[in-house]
């Protein structure tokens, strides 16, 4: 049944969302990388092509999906370009999901359908054209746009569930969400980032769900089924593909790969850089990049102004979201908190590479070997939803001043 709203005949504008996704996809295709690129790009393109195992944990869902794109009969396109198209397509689908979520939020305060579609299109286009999102969407540097798509789909399904948690489709939606969480984990650990927000949404909207053991068992089963691509790793490893990192042909080797044992991550309380000056400072640096980034020429003053405007728009949008649609805010607000402050704390990065460069590369400071803005691709993309809500709120205020 359609979610309850102030507009009884509300229907998600799937056609408008699809058109928006197509526009975003066209932008990415027009700027698509013609081949491979730096860092992990070649490793992952090659691993997908040979059904191999890239560095732990091996990202088996991406490998399977990438292999599918690698063998598509797309004329004379190289394997690299085909897999770059995968990045563009998955990111464009994510933009469509942000469109649907934004439109749903706006149902509670914009009476006209065209107004909601305009606001939703703004959210999708803003999120899709940020530096990190665009950069990852035109060359398959790794697995992050697949994670972005998965988390955006989970977000849309959770918003739909929150509208009618007692409806006939509610349990099926939760099982599907659990499956997608598991499948997302088989792509990258990032796929679990929606989990805490889903739990909060269920706890607020229908807490008795946690007492329904049959649904919980089925959901856990769906979660494990989603993670089943990991079972392909020992099979492929036994065939010794050209890329076979960790060679997980035994149970111990498989667990070592699955648990990312080679990285030796320090305890969370053992901070590799100060949380505020170092790690939050690194996030703010990456946030500043989103609307003005040039690898040759930097404009720190203009960057900071644009970033502050974008930050304030998002905070305004988040506040309006809380005031006007609590049902979806419980999920989306927790999701944004997880993608930012919680994720920054959990990742526990050293000083960012560009931070160290700006500090003159002091020998006594531990620095990351590269900039890792891609870990926050979902946060930057989803922030487009709140920034669009902020723009709509300003638009509404200006319109009221002129009596329209």
Regions found by a protein language model. Give the residues of each.
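Membrane-interface transmembrane helices that cradle and orient dolichyl/undecaprenyl
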Residues: 110-114, 137, 146, 154-174, ...
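Perimembrane helix-loop-helix junctions
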Residues: 162-163, 194-224
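Aromatic- and kink-enriched transmembrane "portal" helix at the membrane-lumen/periplasm boundary
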Residues: 29-33, 76-84, 109, 113, ...
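Transmembrane-helix signature of polytopic, membrane-embedded enzymes
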Residues: 14-19, 98-129, 165-172, 329-330, ...
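Transmembrane-helix motifs of polytopic, lipid-linked glycan transferases
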Residues: 85-110, 153-157, 312-316, 385-388
